[in-house]
């Protein structure tokens, strides 16, 4: 590979970043995968697989490992950031002085800025300026299935149509990976954050033993909360019926590959928050997302009762069963009401 002709540089060598890098490389593209831990990158290079997260998926020959950030960023104008939401801004500030003048940035991070609840587009603009094209990909994707080449579909939104077209061409694979373009930059970002919160609630419900009816009701009312918040932020309501909304919500709320769902199940079974996080052993994005989504809802005056009760469990010590009973005890209302 020429030092500057990779199709994509992927920042973040966890399970999802690795899966996306494998998918791009499998499409015939030269891809550079960077991780912050040189020892981890050396292990990936030696094993030619991510043994910790994706042990059965060998790296294509066109996937190149890199531990030097400057070298990784020089390799491609297209940068795909796949890091936890709470370090998203920090990573962007770190890469900004090393990016090529023609750089374009896309992220697969799902969430909002820690503490402030800001959309990641605002974090990116603040860190990188107004001239860099931005994009986001989101949707129902478990890393293990994506890396294995099982059929998967996502949404893609961008501030720049040329960048959106280029990304769709890079990522889309007719055999296994469908990429739907969507002009709703806000909605595609928001869906991925809110679904993490609702998935914790779905897990709690199942952990308590409330059954399939309750889980389905929670998913449906969670979608209503997502849509209300989206409308307040100027998103297109139709987005939440697509991959980045309903698609991701159903996947994360119903399958135990979801860390957020498993975390919620442990809470529903009586485990405390810290012990549940430790047992998961990886980042549970929904834990922080709950606080951030609640902050955003308060800022825009949007009532989100499910999110509020999950917040009470995670941050105020409320019992999961008590939180569920609070929701069940709410006053009767029209299903289509705004609260």
Curated annotation (Swiss-Prot):
It comes from the Bacteria. Its EC number is 1.1.1.94. GO terms for biological process: carbohydrate metabolic process; glycerol-3-phosphate biosynthetic process; glycerol-3-phosphate catabolic process; glycerophospholipid biosynthetic process. It is an enzyme of class 1 (oxidoreductase). InterPro entries: 6-PGluconate_DH-like_C_sf, 6PGD_dom2, G3P_DH_NAD-dep, G3P_DH_NAD-dep_C, G3P_DH_NAD-dep_N, NAD(P)-bd_dom_sf. NADPH binds at residues 15-16, 36, 110, 143, 259, 283, 285. The active site is at 195 (proton acceptor). It catalyses: sn-glycerol 3-phosphate + NAD(+) = dihydroxyacetone phosphate + NADH + H(+); sn-glycerol 3-phosphate + NADP(+) = dihydroxyacetone phosphate + NADPH + H(+). It is found in: Cytoplasm. GO terms for molecular function: glycerol-3-phosphate dehydrogenase [NAD(P)+] activity; NAD binding. Pathway: Membrane lipid metabolism; glycerophospholipid metabolism. Keywords: Cytoplasm, Lipid biosynthesis, Lipid metabolism, NAD, NADP, Nucleotide-binding, Oxidoreductase, Phospholipid biosynthesis, Phospholipid metabolism. GO terms for cellular component: cytosol. Its main location: cytoplasm. It holds the Pfam family NAD_Gly3P_dh_C. Transmembrane segments: none annotated. Sn-glycerol 3-phosphate binds at residues 110, 139, 141, 195, 248, 258-260. Belongs to the NAD-dependent glycerol-3-phosphate dehydrogenase family. Catalyzes the reduction of the glycolytic intermediate dihydroxyacetone phosphate (DHAP) to sn-glycerol 3-phosphate (G3P), the key precursor for phospholipid synthesis. HAMAP family: NAD_Glyc3P_dehydrog. This is Glycerol-3-phosphate dehydrogenase [NAD(P)+]. It comes from Escherichia coli O17:K52:H18 (strain UMN026 / ExPEC).
């Amino acid at each position: 590979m020429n030092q500057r002709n990779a199709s994509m540089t992927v920042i973040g060598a966890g399970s999802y970043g690795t899966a996306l890098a494998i998918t791009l490389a499998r499409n015939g593209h030269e891809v550079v995968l960077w991780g912050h831990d040189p020892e981890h990158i050396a292990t990936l290079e030696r094993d030619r697989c991510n043994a910790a997260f994706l042990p059965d998926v060998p790296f294509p020959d066109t996937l190149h490992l890199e531990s030097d950030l400057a070298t990784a960023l020089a390799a491609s104008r297209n940068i795909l950031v796949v890091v936890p939401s709470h370090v998203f801004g920090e990573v962007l500030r770190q890469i900004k002085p090393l990016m090529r003048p023609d750089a374009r940035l896309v992220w697969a991070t799902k969430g909002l800025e820690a503490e402030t609840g800001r959309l990641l587009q605002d974090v990116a603009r603040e860190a990188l300026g107004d001239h860099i094209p931005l994009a986001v990909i989101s949707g129902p994707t478990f890393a293990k299935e994506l890396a294995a080449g099982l059929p998967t579909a996502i949404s893609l939104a961008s501030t720049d149509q040329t960048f959106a077209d280029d990304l769709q061409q890079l990522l889309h694979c007719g055999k296994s990976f469908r990429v739907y373009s969507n002009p709703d930059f806000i909605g595609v970002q928001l869906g991925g954050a809110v679904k993490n919160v609702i998935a914790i609630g779905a897990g709690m419900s199942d952990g308590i033993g409330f059954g399939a009816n309750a889980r389905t009701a929670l998913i449906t009312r969670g979608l209503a909360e997502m849509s209300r918040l989206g409308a307040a932020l100027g998103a297109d309501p139709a987005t939440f019926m697509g991959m980045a909304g309903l698609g991701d919500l159903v996947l994360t709320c119903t399958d135990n590959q979801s860390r957020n769902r498993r975390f919620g199940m442990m809470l529903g079974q009586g485990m405390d928050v810290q012990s549940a996080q430790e047992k998961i052993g990886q980042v549970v994005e929904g834990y922080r997302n709950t606080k951030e989504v609640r902050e955003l809802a308060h800022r825009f005056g949007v009532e989100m009762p499910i999110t509020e009760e999950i917040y009470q469990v995670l941050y105020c010590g409320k019992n999961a069963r008590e939180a569920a009973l609070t929701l069940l005890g709410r006053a009767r209302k029209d299903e289509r009401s705004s609260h």
